[in-house]
């Protein structure tokens, strides 16, 4: 039977050693689902609230016992006494949103609500004897995503003196996901060798990418291109580059202040100068995607950037849109960006996550399913990417099990789909004039 009989949350640790919420859901027939909630480092100001305890004597204030209590003492009784079916995903999500009663899930915490939302979906898939991607996407979920592999970490994700937060490779020339993963891995290991020969550090950052002390942005880009070529692939044909600028992390009082991360040699740019700078990089290097190139509140700057390079570069809104359909709708109406980053914990339920993906795709925007810098062994985002035919996933570099777990899950899904599996490569960027 599909009726939920137990919902239980506990405090566990994420990949950064910080507490996070784990939720388990059980039905009367014994179907079971478990979910672990991720956490971000650079967060948009309009994100749903991640509830932390604030008790400095415990986990330096980052405990999540309040969120856990909200699941066990408020949400769980509502679900169990309401005799909700595990198949009633939308009803359960809407009930939790109403129970919270705030616009940003600040009462119960998005980390509490999301844990329940995903655990319910996993229990439903278990009840039906289906893989999660098939339960979420039906028979039509078959497209494997192009991986955006963050092989160099900067900004808030590392101690490297570079403002941009992520430097990514995208193996669009591969014919299968399995092949794309191999290409990325070979480039990653070639990059490590190049860094070692230069006497640069090969320690990795939060998302598994290297965080060496490059001389600047262009040094990082050119070194990555060197690694692509050393691995035997063609930059700009088989493998493209991408940035997550995370510009909100160094934007203040109308100025993009690179000195925050790059020291006294870091430039200070106006919005117009930031647009010019990004266009210069696009003209010079094989860049296909730029995330958060402008500050989340600099909509005029976003408009300029979109008009300037939006026909040839994917412009992804992360802090800009925060997986929120109200903000995304405004962006679509005003021609801001051409893609949305999808982070389940930015909005807090699977229902709202799927609504955002659907809205983007209907408007001709791409949707890039993404991890957070604080991750776990949970692989739900891999299943979401396939279920929604998103075509792109961003889940870190080629090291750290919290990142590799998602890649391995995609390998399993591709195997299960067998001949129906698709990997569209460059065609996944349907928002560009290619």
From Swiss-Prot:
It catalyses: (2R)-2-phosphoglycerate = phosphoenolpyruvate + H2O. PROSITE patterns: ENOLASE (PS00164). GO terms for biological process: glycolytic process. Mg(2+) binds at residues 244, 291, 318. It is found in: Cytoplasm; Secreted; Cell surface. (2R)-2-phosphoglycerate binds at residues 165, 343, 372-373, 394. Binds a second Mg(2+) ion via substrate during catalysis. GO terms for cellular component: cell surface; extracellular region; phosphopyruvate hydratase complex. Keywords: Cytoplasm, Glycolysis, Lyase, Magnesium, Metal-binding, Secreted, Virulence. The keyword Glycosyltransferase does not apply. CDD domains: enolase. Its cofactor is Mg(2+). One of its GO terms (molecular function) is laminin binding. It is an enzyme of class 4 (lyase). Pfam families: Enolase_C, Enolase_N. The active site is at residues 207, 343. Pathway: Carbohydrate degradation; glycolysis; pyruvate from D-glyceraldehyde 3-phosphate: step 4/5. Disruption phenotype: Essential, it cannot be deleted, although it can be replaced by its E.coli counterpart. Its EC number is 4.2.1.11. InterPro entries: Enolase, Enolase-like_C_sf, Enolase-like_N, Enolase_C, Enolase_CS, Enolase_N. Catalyzes the reversible conversion of 2-phosphoglycerate (2-PG) into phosphoenolpyruvate (PEP). It is essential for the degradation of carbohydrates via glycolysis. Probably part of the RNA degradosome. Belongs to the enolase family. Homodimer. Component of a possible RNA degradosome complex composed of cshA, eno, pfkA, pnp, rnjA, rnjB, rnpA and rny. Interacts specifically with RNA helicase CshA, PNPase and RNase Y. HAMAP family: Enolase. This is Enolase. The gene is eno.
């Amino acid at each position: 039977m599909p009726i939920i009989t137990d919902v239980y949350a506990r405090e566990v640790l994420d990949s950064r050693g910080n507490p996070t919420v784990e939720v388990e859901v059980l039905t009367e027939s014994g179907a079971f689902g478990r979910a672990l909630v991720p956490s971000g480092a650079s967060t948009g100001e309009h994100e749903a609230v991640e509830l932390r305890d604030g008790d400095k004597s415990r986990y330096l204030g980052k405990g999540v016992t309040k969120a856990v209590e909200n699941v066990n003492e408020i949400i769980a009784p509502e679900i169990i006494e309401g005799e909700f079916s595990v198949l009633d995903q939308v009803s359960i999500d809407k009930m939790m949103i109403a129970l919270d009663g705030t616009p940003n899930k600040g009462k119960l915490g998005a980390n509490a609500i999301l844990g329940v939302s995903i655990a319910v979906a996993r229990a439903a898939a278990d009840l039906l004897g289906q893989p999660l991607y098939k339960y979420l996407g039906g028979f039509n979920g078959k497209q494997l995503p192009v991986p955006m592999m963050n092989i160099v970490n900067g900004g808030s994700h590392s101690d490297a003196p570079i403002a941009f937060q992520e430097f990514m490779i995208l193996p669009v020339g591969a014919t299968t996901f399995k092949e794309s993963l191999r290409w990325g891995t070979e480039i990653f290991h070639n990059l490590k060798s190049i860094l070692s020969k230069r006497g640069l550090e090969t320690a990795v950052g939060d998302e598994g990418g290297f965080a060496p002390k490059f001389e600047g942005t262009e040094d990082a880009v050119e070194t990555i291109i060197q690694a692509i070529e050393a691995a035997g692939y063609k930059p700009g044909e088989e493998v493209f580059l991408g940035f997550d600028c995370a510009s909100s992390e160094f934007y203040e009082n109308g100025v993009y202040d690179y000195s925050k991360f790059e020291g006294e040699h870091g430039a200070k740019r106006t919005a117009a100068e930031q647009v010019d700078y990004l266009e210069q990089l696009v003209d010079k290097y094989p860049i296909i995607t730029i995330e958060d190139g402008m500050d989340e509140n600099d909509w005029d700057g976003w408009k300029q950037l979109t008009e300037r390079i939006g026909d040839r570069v994917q412009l992804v809104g992360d802090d800009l849109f925060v997986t929120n359909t109200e903000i995304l709708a405004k962006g679509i109406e005003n021609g801001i960006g051409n893609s949305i980053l999808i982070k389940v914990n930015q909005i807090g339920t699977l229902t709202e996550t799927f609504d955002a993906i659907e809205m983007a795709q209907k408007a001709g925007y791409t949707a890039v399913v993404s991890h957070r810098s604080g991750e776990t062994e949970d692989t739900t985002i891999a299943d979401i990417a396939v279920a929604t035919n998103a075509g792109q996933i961003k889940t870190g570099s080629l090291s750290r099990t919290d990142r590799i777990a998602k890649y391995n899950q995609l390998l399993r899904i591709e195997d299960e789909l067998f001949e129906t599996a698709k990997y569209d490569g460059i065609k996944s960027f349907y928002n560009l004039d290619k």
